């Protein structure tokens, strides 16, 4: 073959992109000159995680490849260019820009959201949920809206409802059927789901057929239902199912299914052998597959067809596990049990914990045919393995869905899985594939992921993959090294446990007993501050005590942050950001006297920069005399509790956010932790304190406080997640006590709560079980520990300035009183700064 | 490189502090000089000292690691207080430790490690801090400079 063939792919969605990757990775570009047309502005992105667009991810981070991927691979990508016609006679595709010849053509046009033919469905603010542009439109429409309705209570509908709720709209879901998620759950499961979702404040209206949409009175729209009941809302999102985008194929006469979809065979060939179809537009064996994993398998089959391989598409498993509005829902195989007449079912319903589980098993009770889970997905992975690998069920199949405490419920350990067990269904990676990459030299999780792509699709298999990889590495005698540094063969968490259990109070004791013998046992700048922090969390002795001082980072040693020229900053605590005029004046006077640059921080306090080492004790002496205390701006510890002005002044406020912020700041000040901790408290849902970007965020409600956890600003912002609702003051303190102590206990060094949470096996659900339901039985202990820290608080600066021994370090030179002469300042905008 | 950077800064310092400088310049440039006492040191950590040498004044970081030399000396170290990476005089305020068998100090600003023995930077083989001889005479700490 002397000339390249022209291969055109229509659609740059998830599946079309996967096909491009197959072509690039397997050297097919020598044979094909590939051109991809994408109607959307953006290059292919992760539609499965589309909703994360609302929680801080942008188009670039959702993209499935780097910006230059297509260009460097030699594939032409034409975004914002829709194909409007396929001319099969001349073998050309037509766009507004021109005509392009093809030898082979692949349709990967996906599907579009179905909008029911209701009069008024095209009004402004009637939207759908499929693309990034759709989400931009929703966000724009939500700006001046207070209520939103989702039409359709299926999987995507509930996801859209969650998004509206996240945009602070009062949200309702309107479903035509008699239960939510009619495809995935039965009546009992649907009922439970409704209860849970209503408890989150989303209104659920079942058996409602919308007749028309017209002008509303109080809101922008009014929806009129079959029985003339009405619902008013400012914004409507239709999520009433998807339809294949098969218009191009229809127009050029390809075979189309009765209810839509381009008919394909096992090779993904359409009725014209020059044309293939893959993904959600393709109809195989009378079925459309509305999930990404089957689409990827089709892409692999299509690649094989284009290169004369023999991989075929043979249908796909539609098992799914999701978290919708924070509610677990899982569905495996024949979840309704209506495809196997002889199937038998086990059901378990816990009306208190609101969990429902159902097993569908073969008549001999040996094989799992399907399963349905609502409220708790913890057994999903195990059940899926039984199902997809045909593993024989235990004698008492019911034990698989009974609560853990009532016995049995053995999870299938990674060792028990057969080689053929599918671990990652998105990329079709089996346990055998993983073993092979390890045998070929992969030494850790990252290596396995890079080699197999496992867990880089929907991410649902992350925990399972990790356990398989760890298990296989250990089976091969590879020590999975989690040591903190060369001085200790322990993780931070293990060191923490050792310190607590053995009551070790100094670094010297710890390294004598548990350090590695082949070092000088001096420690280093990794383990010393980490151990210092652990000791402080456990015993709360002043960090400047003789036994602890050599462990501290310079910032902790001098209880101030070292700046780039060797001077320090001074940050007194201003709890909740509330400060009297008298104290403000003192800050000004001190700053003036010691020539300090002054700046208001984002933590609602005042930072004084440029203090010389030898001036620090005098500066603090004056501040302490005026009633200030240290702000721990230097420590891995509580920084500030930011607050809005709240109900005392604000006309919207429903609780006293400033009062609460001061309470919290005073309670947790001085707590040493794996990394810094920031709080925010807002007085109502308008959230002026931006509490959802904090480790601990608190938002007032009519009835108390909603608690959010594990948020973060910075390089990788992360919205805090709703953890508990309508707590009273006492409950709030208790929950935060437990949460913080559990974090202090289990996090790695320098791991913020957000990263800790992302790495926590079991995620938020697990955290809730531990903190709210006391599943580990440690809550009393956590509360006690926190109370000890609270009770033993003392201002480190007050402690230091009353101890001449401690003050002796606060001079530039041991043998000379002069200040460091090489610190040179210059002036800018009326203040000093380093020259 | 370190030497010249330090020298230049000291020239500026001289101008700024000419009075103080004169006081010290009148001292004799003896080989060994007393800088402080044992009580001024902080075990397993550092302090800074001002030193007048034949080449002009220097800021020296002195580290005290009791027990490290197992009685054979080797428990006092003196090196540049000046951190060549940040150009600030801060080395004495770094964390002391041992890495790959050698006692080191980590710069408190950008965290590079310097070997106490010879001042060698572990992250950049082109960078080396100056070192001075240092010893106890009874309870006094003496540096050769
Ligand atoms: C909110 C949301 C959540 C989801 N969650 C999950 C989940 O948890 N798990 C799961 O498995 N699946 C999920 N899905 C489904 C999954 O995203 C789809 O199965 C998958 O994206 C299908 O890939 P595709 O390439 O077939 O279609 P798409 O990704 O839709 O790509 C088709 C592309 O073709 C373009 N196109 C169409 N016509 C033309 C034309 N004429 N010319 C040029 N370009 C054209 C379209 O603009 C589009 O970009 C979710 C979908 C949504 C919307
Ligand atoms: C890796 C990233 C970051 C580092 C290393 C860092 C470091 C620091 C340091 C050292 C200080 C104290 C300044 C001083 O007093 O000398 C500080 C203060 C502060 N930082 Fe950051 N910071 C980081 C990211 C952030 C982010 C992302 C935010 C906001 C979203 C933030 C908000 C603040 C605020 C509000 C203060 C002042 C707090 C106070 O009043 O004590 N920081 N930061
Ligand atoms: S969050 Fe609410 S209470 Fe607080 S300032 Fe904003 S509007 Fe007022």
Question: Residue spans of the language-model regions?
Answer:
Chain B
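Active-site loop/oxyanion-hole signature of alpha/beta-hydrolase fold enzymes
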Residues: 125
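Short cysteine clusters
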Residues: 83, 107-110
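N-terminal pre-ligand scaffold of iron-sulfur
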Residues: 2-102, 115-116, 128-145
């Amino acid at each position: 073959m002397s000339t390249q063939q022209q291969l055109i792919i229509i659609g740059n969605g998830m599946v079309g992109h996967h096909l491009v990757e197959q072509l690039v990775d397997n050297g097919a570009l020598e044979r094909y000159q590939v051109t991809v047309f994408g109607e959307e502005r953006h290059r292919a992105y992760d539609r499965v995680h589309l909703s994360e667009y609302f929680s801080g991810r942008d188009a670039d981070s959702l993209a499935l490849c780097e910006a230059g991927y297509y260009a460097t691979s030699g594939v032409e990508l034409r975004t914002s260019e829709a194909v409007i016609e396929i001319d099969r006679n001349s073998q050309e595709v037509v766009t507004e820009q021109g005509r392009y010849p093809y030898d082979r053509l692949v349709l990967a046009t996906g599907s579009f959201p179905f909008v029911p033919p209701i009069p008024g469905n095209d009004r402004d603010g009637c939207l759908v949920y499929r693309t990034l542009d759709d989400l931009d439109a929703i966000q724009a429409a939500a700006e001046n809206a207070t209520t939103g309705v989702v039409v359709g209570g299926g999987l995507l509908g509930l996801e859209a409802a969650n998004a509206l709720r996240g945009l602070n709209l009062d949200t309702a879901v309107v479903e035509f059927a008699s239960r939510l998620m009619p495809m995935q759950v039965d009546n009992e499961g649907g009922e439970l789901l409704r209860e849970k979702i209503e408890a989150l404040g989303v209104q659920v209206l079942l058996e409602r057929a919308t007749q028309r949409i017209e002008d509303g009175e109080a809101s922008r729209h009014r929806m009129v239902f079959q029985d003339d009941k009405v619902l008013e809302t400012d914004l409507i999102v239709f999520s009433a199912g998807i339809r294949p985008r098969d218009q191009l194929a229809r127009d050029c006469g390809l075979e189309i299914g009765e209810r839509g979809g381009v008919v394909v065979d096992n090779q993904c060939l359409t009725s014209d052998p020059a044309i293939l179809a893959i993904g959600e537009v393709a109809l195989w064996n009378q079925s459309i597959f509305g999930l990404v994993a089957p689409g990827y398998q089709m892409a692999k089959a299509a690649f094989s067809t284009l290169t004369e391989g023999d991989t075929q598409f043979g249908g796909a498993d539609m098992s799914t596990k999701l978290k919708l509005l924070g509610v677990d829902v899982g569905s495996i195989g024949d979840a309704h049990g209506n495809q196997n007449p002889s199937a038998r079912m086990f059901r378990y319903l816990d009306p208190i914990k609101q969990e429902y589980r159902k097993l569908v098993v073969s008549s001999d009770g040996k094989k799992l045919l399907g399963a349905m889970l609502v409220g708790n997905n913890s057994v999903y992975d195990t059940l899926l393995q039984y199902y997809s690998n045909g593993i024989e069920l235990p004698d008492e199949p019911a034990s698989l869905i009974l609560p853990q405490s009532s016995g049995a419920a053995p999870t299938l350990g990674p060792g028990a899985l057969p080689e053929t067990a599918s671990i990652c269904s998105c990329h079709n990676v089996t346990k055998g594939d993983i073993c092979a990459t390890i045998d070929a030299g992969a030494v850790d999780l990252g290596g396995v992921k890079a080699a197999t792509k496992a867990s880089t699709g929907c991410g649902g298999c992350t925990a399972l993959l990790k356990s398989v990889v760890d298990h296989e590495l250990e089976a091969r005698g590879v020590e999975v090294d989690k040591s903190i540094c060369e001085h200790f063969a322990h993780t931070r968490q293990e060191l923490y446990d050792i310190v607590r259990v053995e009551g070790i109070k100094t670094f010297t004791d710890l390294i004598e007993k548990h350090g590695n013998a082949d070092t000088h046992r001096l420690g280093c700048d990794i383990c010393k501050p980490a151990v210092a922090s652990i000791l402080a969390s456990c015993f709360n002795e002043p960090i400047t005590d003789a036994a602890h001082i050599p462990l501290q980072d310079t910032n902790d040693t001098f209880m101030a942050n070292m700046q780039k020229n060797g001077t320090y900053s001074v940050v007194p605590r201003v709890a909740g950001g509330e400060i009297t005029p008298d104290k403000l004046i003192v800050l000004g006077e001190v700053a003036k006297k010691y020539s300090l640059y002054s700046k208001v921080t984002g933590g609602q306090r005042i930072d004084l920069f440029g203090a010389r080492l030898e001036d620090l004790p005098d500066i603090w002496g004056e501040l302490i005399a005026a009633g200030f205390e240290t702000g721990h701006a230097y420590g891995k510890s509580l920084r500030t509790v930011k607050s809005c002005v709240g109900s005392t002044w604000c006309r919207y406020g429903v609780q006293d956010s400033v009062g609460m912020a001061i309470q919290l700041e005073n309670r947790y000040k001085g707590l040493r932790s794996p990394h810094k901790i920031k709080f925010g408290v807002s007085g109502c849902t308008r959230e002026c304190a931006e509490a959802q970007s904090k480790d601990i965020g608190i938002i007032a409600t009519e009835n108390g406080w909603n608690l959010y956890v594990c948020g973060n600003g910075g390089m990788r912002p992360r919205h805090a997640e709703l953890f508990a609702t309508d707590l009273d003051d006492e409950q709030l303190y208790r929950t935060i006590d437990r949460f913080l102590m559990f974090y202090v206990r289990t996090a790695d060094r320098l791991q913020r709560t957000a990263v800790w949470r992302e790495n926590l096996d079991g995620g938020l659900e697990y955290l809730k079980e531990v903190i709210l339901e006391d599943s580990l039985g440690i809550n009393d202990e956590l509360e006690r520990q926190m109370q000890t820290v609270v009770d033993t608080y003392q201002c480190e600066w007050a402690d230091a300035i009353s101890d001449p021994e401690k003050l002796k370090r606060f001079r530039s030179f041991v043998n000379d009183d002069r200040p460091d002469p090489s610190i040179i300042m210059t002036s800018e905008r009326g203040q000093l700064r380093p020259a | 490189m370190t030497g010249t950077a330090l020298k230049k800064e000291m020239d500026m310092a001289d101008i700024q502090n000419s009075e103080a400088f004169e006081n010290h310049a009148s001292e004799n440039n003896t080989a060994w000089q007393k800088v402080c006492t044992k009580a001024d040191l902080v075990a397993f950590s550092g302090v800074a000292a001002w030193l007048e040498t034949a080449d002009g004044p220097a800021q020296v970081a002195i580290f005290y690691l009791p027990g490290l030399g197992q009685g054979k000396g080797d428990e006092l170290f003196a090196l540049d207080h000046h951190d060549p990476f940040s150009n600030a005089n801060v080395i004495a305020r770094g964390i002391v430790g041992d890495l790959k068998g050698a006692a080191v100090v980590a710069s408190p600003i950008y965290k590079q490690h310097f070997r106490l023995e010879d001042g060698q930077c572990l992250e950049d083989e082109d960078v080396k801090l100056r070192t001075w001889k240092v010893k106890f005479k009874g309870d006094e700490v003496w540096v050769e400079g």
